[in-house]
Each structure stands twice: as C-alpha cells, then as structure tokens.
Amino acid sequence: VGNALPNSQQWRDAKRLRDAGCTIIRTAHYPQDPSFMDACDELGLFVIVATPGWQYWNKDLQFGELVHRNTREMIRRDRNHPSVLMWEPILNETRYPLDFALKALDITKEEYPYPGRPVAAADVHSAGVKEHYDVVYGWPGDDEKEDRPEQCIFTREFGENVDDWYAHNNDNRASRSWGEHPLLVQALSLAKSYDEMYRTTGLFIGGAQWHPFDHQRGYHPDPYWGGIYDAFRQKKYAYEMFRSQSSASLRHPLAECGPMVFVAHEMSQFSDKDVVVFSNCDSVRLSVYDGTKTWTKPVVHAKGHLPNAPVVFENVWDFWEARSYSYTQKNWQKVNMIVEGIINGKVVCTQKKMPSRRSTKLRLYADTGNVNLVADGSDFIVVVAEVTDDNGNVRRLAKENIVFTVEGEGDIIGDATIGANPRAVEFGSAPVLIRSTRKAGKIKVKARVLFEGTQAPTAAELEFESVPAEFPFCYEEREIASAAVRTRLQKENTVDGRRTPKGVG
C-alpha cells in the first residue's frame, strides 16, 4: 500500500511500538501522519519530528529556504502535541553550511517561543551543531571522549552494522522466511547494541532502533529486513527481546506489559542445542520432557548493562533424545518444554512449547489491535493464516501456498502478480491484507492450500464485521460504462458466479 496507510493502521503501528517497550519514536525522515501523532499522545510515546530530507543538498539559496519553510510548517502542525520531545530541523545525513544550521535552530525557537519548548537535535559532526544545538546525535562512547559535547547525546539510529554499503550484509537484518537461527542472531545482535547504550555516562540519554518494520526501499534491491516486525507486522524474536526490557511492574492501560517469558526456540530437528529465553522476571525455570530435567537461572540485571539480559540454557535440546520418546517409547506428548518466569519466589508467567508434528490444518486470525475495521473503502487489516498440527502448534518449516477468498463487504489487496494471493508460507504463516468496502457488514475470509488433497492441511474460515464510517462520503457515484462493457467486466471477474482473485483459478 506504500504511503497509503489508513488512520487505523497508524494507531496500530504506534501501539505495536508501545507493546515492544518503545518510549520514543523518531519519525525519520519526514513527519508522520497527524493520526500517528494523535496515537502517540494517547499511548504515551515521545516523538522526535524530523523535517523532510535525506542525503541531498543543493547550493541554490532557494533550496535552503524551502527546507526552512517545511520546518516552520512542520512545527506549526505538531507543536500542540504533548508527545513532541524534539524537533529535527535539519536534513538527515547531509552536509550543509553553518548559516543553514543556525537558521534552522532559530526557527524552532521562533515557532514555539515558550518555556519547556521541544528541543532541537542534529548530528554532532555537522556545522554549528555541537556549539549551538540543544541535543546532539552521536554514539555510545562519544560521551567519554576528550572533545565530548556539553549537551546530552542521543543515537538517532542504532543496531546497524553492515559489512559495506553495497552488499548490506548485516546480522541485525533477518527475514522471517529465513527461520529460527537467523531470527535469534538478529535478536541477540540488537540486544548487544542496546546493551552498549547502557555502558555510558549520564550524558548519553538513549537511542532509536532503525527500523521497527521491514519495508521496501528504492536504493537497494533487497527489502530492509532489520525490523522487529516484518512488513505485515508479524513479530520476530527481536520484538520479544525488546519487550523483555520493560519492567515486570510496568502497567499501561492500552499496551502489552507486565511479567513475561519467551522461548526463542522451535524444538525442530534443526534447532540449536542451547535454548535462549527472554524475560523480565527475577529468574527463569526451564523444564523439558514433563519435568524430567529442570534448570533455573537468574535474569541478570547488571548495572551498566541492559535491564534484563537474555538467559541462555546450554545443551538442553537434543533431537535424538527427543526422538527416543516419540519414536522408541511412542510417547510424543512428553516432548515438551515449559518455561516459567519467577518473581519473589512465585511463578508469574509461563510458556509451553512442543515440536510441531505434521501439517494438518490452517488457522486464521485477524490482527485488529482492538481497533474496528472501518467501512470507508480504504481501511484494511492483516489476516494471517498459520499452518498447524493437530494440537495447534505452528509448523514453522511448512512450505505451502495459501489461497485466500473473501465473501461479504471486503476485498483482498493484491493478487498473484505480486505474490499476494496465493501467498507463500514463511516461518509457518501467510498474511493477507483485507480492505473494507464502503458498506459496513460481515466479512468472511477463507483460506486453503493451493494444492488440496486428503493429506493436505484442511481449510479455515474467519468471520468479522466492519463498522460504519464516522463521516459521510462527499462524492456522487455515476455509471459511465456502457451495458456491454459492464457485462464483460462482470464475466471477467467471476468464476461460477463467485469473485476470484486475479491469477487464481
């Protein structure tokens, strides 16, 4: 959908970030939609609002003036949002003259000349910034150099460490389709970067991870895979790592919070021997094979390090040992892993995992974020089809293709030409975007495997409703096609009287 994100998804994205434990968002490299700012106000997220621009400067004087005009308009639009913590009134990663930087700073003061104004932030290495700006962008360690700035230091983009800017190979970037091990490497890489920011002096105040969501980009053939969510907002292991950094005592009226444990392990024939657990509890107890073996380890909360270090249980998983229960003893139910989070000696949260067996059925869920789908013709939600075994365990190694169909007041965004429908299963799931029509009503989503059969996973259905739009539509609908054209189009878009996605028979 590109930049055509409806207001509901702006809110859902802000909540997803709050769920992950984020408390500050840098809206690079341009201001976000006003609905995103409203969501940040509601959810308690600080925002750094950046003026549009990235890695380009034009010596024509009019270019700088146009940037300054953008900055004034940006501040006037967002200055009454309580979520705004900083303005970024300069161009990202761009070399510009001193007078431009000073004028940009003056504009932030002119447009909000009151006590407690949002501060201005810019790169410490750019002209005039270290000497004049309120906050400087830098890195952990800049606060301990001899020429360190006097202002607070903030890292505008942390987590990236590419081998070079041509190949873009990087251990913090992992597609969900690559599976368990790359996702774990990504999570631990980001944990290391996050940890580095705590090994600093009080001059260093934090940073923003680049970037929370996988996305397409114009300057490189690969999508950006460094998100803690994929492009369809499915969580990766890195999401759980960041969520584990929030205090177990935190309470929030809208966001996910509280004690948590997460096992970053799928118990497959290819899984690592070590089991990594993310938790914000005092300690973690790991049991396998119905408690046949049990270990307990503390969650390290060391001063000068990230709040809750990942817990690693060494040499726990052995596929051949698990096979002795399922194959030799015919007791596959005993092959399980239970992780318990303990605070003050009491178990406060639990997660149970089992290896997925054969793929037998599909399961659908809608990622609504507790926000209704609005019948305005542009709102949409993500519906996810998971391939599971008989017991509901997601089959992470499944390689199916899922065909989606919709009945009622909804449509599928995309078709076979872009791999949207049918959709290949990645890491056990296949997402699809369901868009509302302009009429409120029931929507039924059906999912089946592309190649059906008696041994193939069974189909699934999910039904939900859209709600009426808040405001009436301001347009007049007219039919301009002739009767012959309308008849031809209807025939092209139906098979046996049913609507079908393009490219699917």
Describe the role of every protein-language-model region.
Residues 8-16, 24-240, 255-266, 270, ...:
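Substrate-binding/catalytic cleft of secreted carbohydrate-active enzymes
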Residues 252, 353-376, 466-491, 497:
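Low-complexity, Pro/Ser/Thr- and charge-rich linker/hinge segments at domain boundaries
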